[in-house]
C-alpha cells in the first residue's frame, strides 16, 4: 500500500470533535478566492474537486471528496485550502504550501496544530495518540495475524469494519464471517489517525452482519449500531473493538449466565443475566463490561446497592471521550507494577471518588479461578456500602427522595451545579439521568448509580479542562420545621476564588454551618439535630463552618498559610488553589491523597509537594509527627464525645447522629441508636437560653468527626472548636477548664486515660 496515500488519508484526522473552527483563517468551501494559509492565492474547493474527486481511499475505495463532505471541517466552512494552503500555483502539478506527499507524521501533526492549538481550535491530540496504546500495541505481531488484525492493525480494522466483521466472539470466531483481505496481513501496520477517521476527520462507518433466526441465507450486512440510535457515532466506532453489548442489547462477557444478587437479605433474591462471549473472554481486563457496566438490580447482603462499573452515556456524541482523550492508556489491569506506569485512570479507580472500584475488581480477580470464571467474578464485584457508602447507600438518582443530594452524590448533579451554581435547582429537578437504565423524565429513578466520573469535574477529560463555577457563594438553607415550630433564616457564605479548587469546594462545604443554629427561632429548644453533613474540609479551611461561641475569637493566626496554597501568596505551591495544591501535587494525583498510609493507618510518606515546599527546616513534617497529630486529633474528639455523653447526649455514626442515653451508662447501646430515641431536648441540659450552645457543641463534634483531615486542613480552627465545645458542655460556662473536663471523663469511665492524655497533648493547657 502507498505510504503517501496513508499519510494523505491521515492528514486531518487529529481531534476534530469539539468546537467550531471559524477563525482558522482558511478559505471557505464555497470557493471564495483570496489569500490562503502559506500566502498563496486560493482557487476555491470547486477547482480542487475537479481533479481530486477521482482520488479514493486506498482501503475502502470511497472518494476522499465524499469523505471530506462528511467532516466537521466541511460543515464549518473550512475548505481544502484551509489545510493544504492556496492552490493558485498548483494546477495539478505545481507546489502547494502544505503538501502531504513526503511529509513525516510529525510534520503533518505540526500542520494540524497550527489551528489545533487549543485557542483557535481544539488542541491537537497527536502527541497523546502517538504515545498511547493504539499506536504502540503491546504485541506488534498481533497486527500481522489474520484474525487479530481486526482490532490490532490499521488495515485490518478498516477492512473488517467495512466487511461487517464486528461483534461478539460468536461472530469473530466464525470463519463464515471473516473477510478475505485484499492483501497479506503480514503487510499490515499499527493504527494511525486514519484508522478511525476518514479524509477530513469524519468518523469511519462500521458494519456488522446479522441473520434472521430460522431463515436460511438471511445473513446480511448492516450498520453496527449497538446503542440503537441510528446514528454513526463514537459509541459505535469504539465498541466495534471494545465491545460492550451486541446489536440486540445482550451484555458482553464470558458467555455464561450470571447470577446477580437482588436482595439485601442473605441468601435470597437473584436474577439471571445472560452474557454474550467476547472474543477475549478469559481475562477480565480485556472485557470492557467488567468495569464499564453497572447491573441495575444488584444489591449487597447488608444495605445499599453494588456499583459494578462505570455507566457509559451511550447516546451522547462522545461517550468515550467523557473520560478518555486520545491517550488510550489506562494501565488498570492491576494496581501497581513496573510494567504498569501510573495513570489518572489507575488512580481514580482506587480513589474514594471512584468508589475504590478498581480495588474490588483486582481483589475479585485474585480470588477467582482462571478463564471465564474470572471474568464472571470480576463483573459481579464492585463498590458497596463497606467501601463507598456515599455512592451506594441510597438510590441517588431518585429525584423524589434524593433530589437534594444529587449535587454531590452524582456526576450529573455535580456537573450541572459546577456549570451554573447560581441557576442550579437544589431539588434536583433539572438533572437528567436518561443514560441510566430505566430512568425517564416521568419516573425519574433508576437502579443504577453513578460514581464521581471524570465528566463530573472536567469538561474535556482529554485535556484535563475543568468546569469553572467561579468563586462559590453558598446559601445554607434555614432550618424550618412545622412539627417543632422551628423557623430559621438562610445563611450565606461567600468563599474566595481559588481557581481549580473551586470545583472541590462545590461539594466540600457542608449542608449546614454553625450559624444556621444561631439563625433559628424555637420556642422550647426541642428540635432535631442540625446536621453539618460529611467531608466539609473546604469550610474548615476558611473557618466558616463551625459553631462559634460568643466572646471567642476564631480568626486564623497571622502565619497561617493553608488557605493560600495554590495561589500567588504561596509561591511554589501551584496555581489551582489549596485543594488541588495539597491533594493533587503527588505522583498519584487522582487518588486525592497528600500522604500514603500502611495497613494500620499510620502515615508512611508525605507525598504532596506543597507540604514539602512550606514545611522545611525547623517546621519540617515527618510521617511519624503527622501520624501522632492525627491520633491526638481523634483522641480530642473522643474526649468531646465523652463530655457530651456525660450530659446524656450519645454520638452514634448514623443519622441523626445524637441519641438519648436512656440508661445513663455513657454508651450508645443498640436499643438506644434508633431514630425514635434521637436526642432533641437541647434546652434540657442548661436551659432554654443556652440550647443553641448545647447543640453547637454536638454540631462541632459531628462536623469534625466527619472531617478526618481536620487536623491538617486548619488545625487552629479545629482545635478552637473542640476546646470551646468541651469547655462549654462540661459545665455550661466558657471558663477554660478543659483539662479538668477531660480528666472528669476518665473518672466517670467514659474515656480511657491514654486517650485523655493524647487529647490533652493535642489541645494544650491553654486555649489554642
UniProtKB/Swiss-Prot annotation:
GO cellular component terms listed in the entry, alphabetical order: cell outer membrane
Binding site for heme c 11: 579, 582-583
Binding site for heme c 10: 504, 507-508
Binding positions for heme c 6 per the UniProt entry: 238, 241-242
Topology of this chain in the membrane: Lipid-anchor
Post-translational modification, as annotated: Binds 12 heme c groups per subunit.
Protein keywords: Cell outer membrane, Electron transport, Heme, Iron, Lipoprotein, Membrane, Metal-binding, Palmitate, Signal, Transport
One Pfam family this sequence matches: Cytochrome_C554
One term of GO molecular function: oxidoreductase activity
UniProt xrefs under SUPFAM superfamilies: Multiheme cytochromes
Annotated InterPro entries: Cyt_c-552/4, Multihaem_cyt_sf, Multiheme_Cytochr_ET
Binding site for heme c 1: 48, 51-52
Binding site for heme c 12: 611, 614-615
Binding positions (heme c 7): 320, 323-324
Residues at which heme c 4 binds: 148, 151-152
Keyword hit for Nucleotide-binding: no
Record protein name field: C-type polyheme cytochrome OmcC
Source organism (scientific name): Geobacter sulfurreducens (strain DL-1 / KN400)
Recorded name of the encoding gene: omcC
Amino acid at each position: 500500500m502507498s505510504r503517501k496515500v496513508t499519510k494523505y488519508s491521515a492528514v486531518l484526522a487529529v481531534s476534530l470533535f469539539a468546537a467550531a473552527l471559524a477563525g482558522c483563517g482558511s478559505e471557505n468551501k464555497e470557493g471564495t478566492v483570496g489569500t490562503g494559509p502559506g500566502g498563496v492565492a486560493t482557487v476555491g474547493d470547486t477547482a480542487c474537486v475537479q481533479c481530486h474527486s477521482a482520488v479514493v481511499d486506498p482501503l475502502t475505495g470511497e472518494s476522499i471528496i465524499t469523505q471530506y463532505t462528511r467532516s466537521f471541517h466541511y460543515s464549518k466552512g473550512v475548505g481544502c485550502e484551509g489545510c493544504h494552503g492556496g492552490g493558485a500555483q498548483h494546477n495539478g502539478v505545481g507546489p502547494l504550501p502544505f503538501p502531504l506527499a513526503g511529509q513525516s507524521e510529525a510534520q503533518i501533526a505540526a500542520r494540524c496544530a497550527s489551528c489545533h492549538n487549543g485557542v483557535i481550535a481544539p488542541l491537537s491530540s497527536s502527541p497523546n495518540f502517538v504515545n498511547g496504546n493504539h499506536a504502540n500495541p503491546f504485541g506488534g505481531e498481533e497486527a500481522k495475524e489474520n484474525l487479530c488484525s481486526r482490532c490490532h492493525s490499521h488495515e485490518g480494522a478498516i477492512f473488517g469494519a467495512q466487511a461487517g466483521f464486528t461483534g461478539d466472539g460468536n461472530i469473530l470466531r466464525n470463519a463464515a464471517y471473516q473477510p478475505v483481505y485484499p492483501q497479506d496481513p503480514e503487510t499490515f501496520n499499527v493504527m494511525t489517525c486514519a484508522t478511525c477517521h476518514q479524509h477530513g476527520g469524519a468518523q469511519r462507518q462500521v458494519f456488522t452482519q446479522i441473520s434472521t433466526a430460522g431463515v436460511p441465507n438471511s445473513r446480511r450486512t448492516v450498520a453496527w449500531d449497538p446503542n440503537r440510535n441510528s446514528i454513526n457515532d463514537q459509541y459505535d466506532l469504539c465498541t466495534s473493538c471494545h465491545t460492550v453489548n451486541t446489536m440486540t442489547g445482550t451484555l458482553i462477557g464470558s458467555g455464561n449466565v450470571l447470577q446477580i444478587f437482588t436482595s439485601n437479605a442473605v441468601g435470597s433474591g437473584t436474577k439471571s443475566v445472560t452474557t454474550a462471549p467476547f472474543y477475549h473472554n478469559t481475562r477480565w481486563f480485556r472485557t470492557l463490561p467488567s468495569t464499564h457496566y453497572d447491573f441495575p438490580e444488584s444489591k449487597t447482603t447488608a444495605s445499599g446497592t453494588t456499583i459494578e462499573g462505570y455507566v457509559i452515556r451511550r447516546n451522547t456524541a462522545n461517550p468515550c471521550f467523557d473520560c478518555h482523550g486520545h491517550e488510550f492508556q489506562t494501565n488498570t489491569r492491576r494496581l501497581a507494577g513496573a510494567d504498569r506506569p501510573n495513570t489518572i485512570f489507575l488512580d481514580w479507580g482506587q480513589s474514594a471518588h471512584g468508589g475504590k472500584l478498581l480495588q474490588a475488581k483486582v481483589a475479585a480477580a485474585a480470588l477467582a479461578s482462571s478463564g471465564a470464571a474470572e471474568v464472571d467474578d470480576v463483573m459481579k464485584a464492585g463498590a458497596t456500602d463497606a467501601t463507598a457508602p456515599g455512592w451506594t447507600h441510597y438510590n441517588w438518582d431518585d429525584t423524589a427522595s434524593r433530589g437534594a443530594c444529587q449535587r454531590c452524590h452524582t456526576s450529573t448533579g455535580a456537573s450541572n451545579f459546577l456549570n451554573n451554581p447560581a441557576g442550579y435547582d437544589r431539588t434536583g429537578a433539572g438533572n437528567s439521568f436518561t443514560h441510566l437504565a430505566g430512568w425517564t423524565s416521568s419516573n425519574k429513578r433508576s437502579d443504577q448509580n453513578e460514581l464521581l466520573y471524570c465528566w463530573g469535574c472536567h469538561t474535556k477529560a482529554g485535556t484535563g479542562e475543568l468546569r469553572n463555577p467561579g468563586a462559590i457563594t453558598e446559601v445554607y438553607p434555614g432550618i424550618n420545621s412545622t412539627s417543632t415550630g422551628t423557623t430559621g433564616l438562610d445563611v450565606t457564605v461567600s468563599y474566595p476564588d481559588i481557581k481549580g479548587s473551586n470545583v472541590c469546594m462545590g461539594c466540600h462545604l457542608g449542608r449546614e454551618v454553625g450559624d444556621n443554629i444561631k439563625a433559628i427561632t424555637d420556642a422550647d429548644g426541642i428540635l432535631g439535630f442540625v446536621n453539618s453533613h460529611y467531608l466539609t474540609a473546604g469550610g474548615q479551611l476558611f473557618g466558616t463552618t463551625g459553631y462559634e461561641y460568643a466572646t471567642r475569637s476564631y480568626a486564623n493566626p497571622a502565619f497561617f498559610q493553608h488557605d493560600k496554597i495554590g495561589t500567588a501568596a504561596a509561591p511554589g505551591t501551584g496555581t489551582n488553589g489549596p485543594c488541588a495544591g495539597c491533594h493533587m501535587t503527588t505522583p498519584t494525583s487522582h487518588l486525592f491523597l497528600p500522604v500514603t498510609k500502611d495497613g494500620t493507618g499510620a502515615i508512611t510518606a508525605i507525598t504532596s509537594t506543597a507540604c514539602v515546599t512550606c514545611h522545611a527546616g525547623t517546621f519540617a513534617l515527618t510521617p511519624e509527627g503527622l501520624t501522632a497529630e492525627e491520633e491526638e486529633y481523634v483522641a480530642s474528639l473522643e474526649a468531646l464525645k465523652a463530655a457530651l455523653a456525660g450530659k446524656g447526649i450519645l454520638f452514634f455514626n448514623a443519622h441523626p447522629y445524637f441519641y438519648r442515653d436512656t440508661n445513663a451508662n455513657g454508651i450508645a447501646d443498640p436499643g438506644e441508636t434508633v431514630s425514635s430515641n434521637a436526642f432533641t431536648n437541647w434546652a434540657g441540659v442548661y436551659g432554654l437560653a443556652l440550647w443553641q450552645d448545647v447543640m453547637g457543641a454536638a454540631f462541632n463534634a459531628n462536623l469534625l468527626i466527619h472531617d478526618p483531615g481536620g487536623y491538617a486542613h486548619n488545625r487552629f480552627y479545629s482545635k478552637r472548636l473542640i476546646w470551646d465545645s468541651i469547655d462549654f458542655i462540661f459545665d455550661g460556662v466558657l471558663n477554660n477548664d478543659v483539662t479538668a473536663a477531660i480528666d472528669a471523663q476518665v473518672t466517670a469511665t467514659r474515656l480511657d486515660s491514654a486517650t485523655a492524655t493524647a487529647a490533652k497533648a493535642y489541645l494544650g493547657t491553654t486555649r489554642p
